[in-house]
Amino acid sequence: MSQTSGPRDEVFTTAVVNSKGQIADGPAHLMRMKDHAKRLRISLPETFPSMDVEVSEMGLVRLSYSVEQGWRVQHRPFTVRNESLDAISVPAPRWNPKTNGCKHGDWAPYNEARVRAEKAGCDVALFVHEHALVDADRGTPMLLDEDGTVWI
């Protein structure tokens, strides 16, 4: 995670990468990153860095851009995958309407939520806004089942 402080300091995307270095849905991630950069008023360079990464196991690759640091490509293994997790819910952080929903540089609320979840003996903090599950501290909630199961 970035140490930048404001939402307009950085734009990023995180994608699944397999053991062959192939990025899942690479073009879609780059399109979303361009859209988010525009919403955040971050001017991206014309060319993107190579998304080819050398990995020995399936994991995540994070592509980020900041004016101060330029492009960065980071790989990390999955910390949890296909297993049952315990969660707490916390109020979702809010910014201005253009910033809400963007992958940006203000990580403080996410870090604080992760620490809060760990102190409660949980694996993840789920962000709720107006009675809806909108995000999580370290992954994107994909589905909320009727029985309360959240798929991240």
Task: Describe the residue ranges of each PLM region.
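Conserved alpha/beta cores of soluble small-molecule-handling proteins
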Residues: 1-132
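Glycine- and Gly-Pro-enriched alpha-helical subdomains that act as flexible
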Residues: 132-152
